[in-house]
Amino acid sequence: MKKMLLATALALLITGCAQQTFTVQNKPAAVAPKETITHHFFVSGIGQKKTVDAAKICGGAENVVKTETQQTFVNGLLGFITLGIYTPLEARVYCSQ
């Protein structure tokens, strides 16, 4: 019984996160993102669209190095608790130094 609970807990811990990184330029990026934005989606984001203007955040398209989207453990937990009704997603923008 303990092994089954441990296996289930480990499976839940490793399957809840997802991250996509889009590299725009091969310049050195800042270690910390210039801005982190949380998008609030409902029903897993079906039919919903959110955008981030990375050029505006970095002061021009030439300063954008990469963008990331990530579903963190907390975001996945919120989606699990609400049965997929509320599913937040974080977006990060990295600018050149």
Curated annotation (Swiss-Prot):
InterPro entries xref list: Lambda_Bor
Lipidation (S-diacylglycerol cysteine): C17
Lipid moiety-binding region (N-palmitoyl cysteine): C17
Location of the protein in the cell: Host cell membrane
Recorded GO CC terms: host cell plasma membrane; membrane
Keywords: Host cell membrane, Host membrane, Lipoprotein, Membrane, Palmitate, Signal
Annotated signal peptide: 1-16
Pfam families: Lambda_Bor
Membrane topology, from the record: Lipid-anchor
Function noted in UniProt: Not known; is expressed during lysogeny in Escherichia coli.
UniProt family annotation: Belongs to the lambda phage bor family.
Protein name, per record: Lipoprotein bor
Organism (species): Escherichia phage lambda
Top-level taxonomy: Viruses, Duplodnaviria, Heunggongvirae, Uroviricota, Caudoviricetes
